[in-house]
UniProtKB/Swiss-Prot annotation:
<keyword id="KW-0808">Transferase</keyword>
<keyword id="KW-0547">Nucleotide-binding</keyword>
<feature type="region of interest" description="Disordered">
    <location>
        <begin position="298"/>
        <end position="321"/>
    </location>
</feature>
<dbReference type="InterPro" id="IPR000719">
    <property type="entry name" value="Prot_kinase_dom"/>
</dbReference>
<dbReference type="InterPro" id="IPR008266">
    <property type="entry name" value="Tyr_kinase_AS"/>
</dbReference>
<dbReference type="GO" id="GO:0106310">
    <property type="term" value="F:protein serine kinase activity"/>
</dbReference>
<feature type="binding site">
    <location>
        <begin position="25"/>
        <end position="33"/>
    </location>
    <ligand>
        <name>ATP</name>
    </ligand>
</feature>
<comment type="function">
    <text>May be involved in plant development processes.</text>
</comment>
<dbReference type="GO" id="GO:0004674">
    <property type="term" value="F:protein serine/threonine kinase activity"/>
</dbReference>
<dbReference type="GO" id="GO:0005524">
    <property type="term" value="F:ATP binding"/>
</dbReference>
<keyword id="KW-0067">ATP-binding</keyword>
<protein>
    <recommendedName>
        <fullName>Serine/threonine-protein kinase Nek7</fullName>
        <ecNumber>2.7.11.34</ecNumber>
    </recommendedName>
</protein>
<keyword id="KW-0723">Serine/threonine-protein kinase</keyword>
<feature type="active site" description="Proton acceptor">
    <location>
        <position position="144"/>
    </location>
</feature>
<feature type="domain" description="Protein kinase">
    <location>
        <begin position="19"/>
        <end position="277"/>
    </location>
</feature>
<feature type="region of interest" description="Disordered">
    <location>
        <begin position="338"/>
        <end position="363"/>
    </location>
</feature>
<dbReference type="Pfam" id="PF00069">
    <property type="entry name" value="Pkinase"/>
</dbReference>
Amino acid sequence: MQMEANDCQEEHKFTLDNYHVVEQVRRGKSSSDFVVLHDIEDKKYAMKKICLAKHTDKLKQTALQEMKLLSSLKNPYIVHYEDSWIDNDNNACIFTAYYEGGNMANAIKKARGKLFPEERIFKWLAQLLLAVNYLHSNRVVHMDLTCSNIFLPKDDHVQLGNYGLAKLINPEKPVSMVSGISNSMCPEVLEDQPYGYKSDIWSLGCCMYEITAHQPAFKAPDMAGLINKINRSLMSPLPIVYSSTLKQMIKLMLRKKPEYRPTACELLRNPSLQPYLLQCQNLSPIYLPVFPIKPVNSPKDKARRNSLPGKFGKERVSREKSEVSRSLENLYPFWTNTETGSSSSSQPASSTNGAEDKLETKRIDPSCDTLKISEFTSQKSDESLIDPDIAVYSTETPAEENALPKETENIFSEESQLRDVDVGVVSAQEVACSPPRAIEEAETQEALPKPKEQITVPISSVAHSSTEVAAAKDHLSGSLEGDKAKMVKLTASEMSSVLSKLTKLGPPQSKERADALECLLEKCAGLVKQEKYEELAGLLTPFGEDGVSARDTAIWFAKTLLSSDKLNQGT
């Protein structure tokens, strides 16, 4: 052993005579820490002296192993190794860099209860995790990770030091030696289990708790109380000024079972640490984020999107509209009554091949008997992009309302080939053909202002939509003639009554649904008393096994309500 010490001393440029002690920082049972000044370089170093005279050869071999280990560890967040040897008095002298900032324990005392900013704590945590992960990847455990061994070279940087107990882990014989019991002692060591990588994670969690709360995680007046608190994980709550993310990460590191604690590598992949990892030195690419981190919807991004050329802007607007439509279909799948159409507006209307296109009814004005269908074009700018559920009032004059049926027929018969058409208004009898969802939208959007002009929209399959409307009208008239009833022409007051009842078919609250079902049963009972079984069958057909669509349900329900109201008024 003495020959190895002499060989080790010959390899070094300086000897102990080139240093003189400035002050003694700490004194322990088997080691002491000093601040020394190098006479030639005029530079301060931290010296750790381990007394080996009263120890066995095994402990001396451990000291030599530690010095060899220190020489191989090179990381920006580990205290820089300077020199080491064994002197003639069997003292292992280990020289490391000295930092004027002191250690974390002194920084907490100097703060005097003033909490550190959360950004700084996250930055320290990221650097400490990088240091611990570097040690673990080299099969090294620190075994003495406390705030006194976390040094502050700069305000926002930390380094791990004091590897007096660090050892290479032997897979066949795990490390089980610990010295004393401290506030950061892990539960598995108290149960005489081997000290492993997860034990360092526990100690790091205790350090982060102390940095955050300015007090130890586990504190008791006696040793029995301390062991009881550690085993039961009894901790005071962290200050409320810190985010739940930081608190959760500290709690994860302080889980009692080692298998439930995350590794340093897993903690480094936490999204909250990504911005701080980007500022670290010599960062491994595995910890870099896949996508660059930037604020969402920042003013710069909005300005860039608004300044896109016309072609890209139109494509983006149409893409956003399609996404909105898909989200609405997923939100209201029961009321979605249309299929995806593949026909183009530039092709004839006969090329639809039976595919249905969406034709939404936007707004109903209760003061008149007209219904206006409107929709925004894809050429509108991003600022004018409005949710498709938002509707508009009809602004036709009374003179225009009288000519509504003719305008409607002309639109659906003569202008079906056009790309951009001015959609007219639908007669009052076609209200029953509208899906309940659209009618409900009309009821819930009454507070919106009325626009002053109509909006031109592209419709690819107007002919098919007109066919549906015509079929619904024929179906209504045929059913009424079969019952020897006359055609009913809605007035404004009757329109409001019908709409208020049809609205209950939508997806409202449970009370409104119960009222609608009660109204349905009352009408069915009235039809049975009047022996109108055909109308009763038509009313109940949508609720059988061969149920029809919501559109047909609205048609039959409206027809029954109107005919019943007329008969009641006649009697």
